[in-house]
Amino acid sequence: MRWQCGTRFRGLRPAVAPWTALLALGLPGWVLAVSATAAAVVPEQHASVAGQHPLDWLLTDRGPFHRAQEYADFMERYRQGFTTRYRIYREFARWKVNNLALERKDFFSLPLPLAPEFIRNIRLLGRRPNLQQVTENLIKKYGTHFLLSATLGGEESLTIFVDKQKLGRKTETTGGASIIGGSGNSTAVSLETLHQLAASYFIDRESTLRRLHHIQIATGAIKVTETRTGPLGCSNYDNLDSVSSVLVQSPENKVQLLGLQVLLPEYLRERFVAAALSYITCSSEGELVCKENDCWCKCSPTFPECNCPDADIQAMEDSLLQIQDSWATHNRQFEESEEFQALLKRLPDDRFLNSTAISQFWAMDTSLQHRYQQLGAGLKVLFKKTHRILRRLFNLCKRCHRQPRFRLPKERSLSYWWNRIQSLLYCGESTFPGTFLEQSHSCTCPYDQSSCQGPIPCALGEGPACAHCAPDNSTRCGSCNPGYVLAQGLCRPEVAESLENFLGLETDLQDLELKYLLQKQDSRIEVHSIFISNDMRLGSWFDPSWRKRMLLTLKSNKYKPGLVHVMLALSLQICLTKNSTLEPVMAIYVNPFGGSHSESWFMPVNEGSFPDWERTNVDAAAQCQNWTITLGNRWKTFFETVHVYLRSRIKSLDDSSNETIYYEPLEMTDPSKNLGYMKINTLQVFGYSLPFDPDAIRDLILQLDYPYTQGSQDSALLQLIELRDRVNQLSPPGKVRLDLFSCLLRHRLKLANNEVGRIQSSLRAFNSKLPNPVEYETGKLCS
């Protein structure tokens, strides 16, 4: 007699000592008759849902029915990926069968009618048999349980195993016939179609089976099994073992079994339970041992690997491999999806797309986002299933010599898909696309492909990157960003053209040369200028007390407007009468490019690191001295007019401290009390003159509004910025540079204030776009 995995029994507790319960037994049975019919359709979902694992006990534990044919069929289908079962069946008249012998014993206290051979085998065991003897003499002959009650009858059923992932795909039918009804060459099989076919099974069995087998062959999404078991007519059977199955399972009436140990003497019961559990759990290959909530088989020398169910382990490893294939299939289907392919077609091909650019297109595609979420949900289900199988697999293998090895599948990140898009765009010139490397802008091709790299457009960006790719060849750079110029296909920093046509600035003297020439007061470095003063004349003695301050002016550009001048030193030859106590004091103001006297800056003599006056005697009498202030290359500056304010002070010797003190002279009303006279023989400026073309600079400024050619405006701006910086470099010392360039535009080019402001704004805006822009604050000098 055979029974199915859904039967319940009594008399069995968890497999821990003391042994009080067993699992499965069949005995020769009874005669029965069947009639009447009943039909039902039962869908069963075998895929585990969240938080429920209805099949874990079947897959992990070797329960009492693991050898039942229905359980074996279920396991085979489950491992093949069929997650849902639809079953339509009908049963024939159920007959309730009870064990009258056991009832007579309980009611009438009569001895059980045990077979003489069974009694003889019990006696042969003796008082203390080992587990092997119990197994050989009792369990292998009579089983572990006997039947208390059951419902007998016949049954015929149709079972459809369904793989829902494959079911919805369109399937091309063969021979031009439709799967359902022959209405076309292509159809999609739905669950509703299967429901209709299953419902028509008992009405038109042959036609239904033919259509179902057609779907099974065409799609591979279903597996059809037809079973007809038990006595299907009103026939009598002398031996129920000749029938494949006559036990009918129903929710209201299950098969009831009782452990065989209740028929045995007290001294054999515990030993029988231990032997039965070892026989069932360890398949007679060892002895079941339970300790600290854990049970295992103590293997016999003949079967050292009894704790390793090879078939189950192999089945789980096969399931893991199938999950790996399903994982790869999910990713491949996502890559082949309409949403993913639509994004590829929508991407621009006139410029290179880095990962950041692709991520922006990805984020704006809502349909692709939804499809990507579907991919993540499907992979999450597979990941949970993988974890469940791995837990069961490691539980089964924890006492095996060989431990399983498996690499968990990993979900592909967004950065992987962005790189995959780059690979499809730029490395798809072969059958199988390669892998794009963004850092090197190259492709790694498959080993069997000599070349897979296609044309890679130029990269756009800021700074040295391209502004636009060439329209005739996107792999080449067509134009560059402001501040860069295209040279040999690359954007290189743009350098301003020479300023010699506008203002010559390349005549600097070396410090040693300059020092030597200034000491000699070489006429070659003297800047010709005109002396102007209303207070005195050169070479004439005057009374310095006549006025507190005298103005001496040197004007350089009165007749030569095509030059600008750079001052390197200023020298005065001052003579005093003998025994004079007067000391000259000079305040120097420099006007760089003309304008009013208020547009001059004060020279900070002997302040900070600025140089002081140097005095050298001209004659032995020491009546005349050369007063020289040397600016050198460090402090040189532009000048057009030099204003010298001359004052006098009285030099006296302090007897108490032996120090020289100075004080301002009082106004003398009596000429006879004169303190001495002063004479200035020479007032010279040493430096050099630079060629200056105001018309050329005006033309350069005009290009800001009316550029001659493409790029000439940028070139003009770059030259003006260079000119501005070179001019402002000669600004006098101070916390803030003076804006000498505005003075140059205002007074030498005669531009209006609004024009000067507009030019300065244009230069600042263009300079901010240049690579590594240098901005500095300037102070206003000219109005």
Swiss-Prot record:
This is BMP/retinoic acid-inducible neural-specific protein 2. Residues 1-33 form the signal peptide. Glycans are attached at N185, N354, N473, N579, N626, N658. GO terms for biological process: cellular response to retinoic acid; central nervous system neuron differentiation; locomotion; multicellular organism growth; negative regulation of mitotic cell cycle; positive regulation of neuron differentiation. It is found in: Secreted. It comes from Homo sapiens. It comes from the Eukaryota. Keywords: Cell cycle, Glycoprotein, Growth arrest, Secreted, Signal. Pfam families: BRINP, EGF_BRNP1-3, MACPF. One of its GO terms (cellular component) is extracellular region. Residues 85-281 form the MACPF domain. Belongs to the BRINP family. Inhibits neuronal cell proliferation by negative regulation of the cell cycle transition. InterPro entries: BRINP, MACPF.
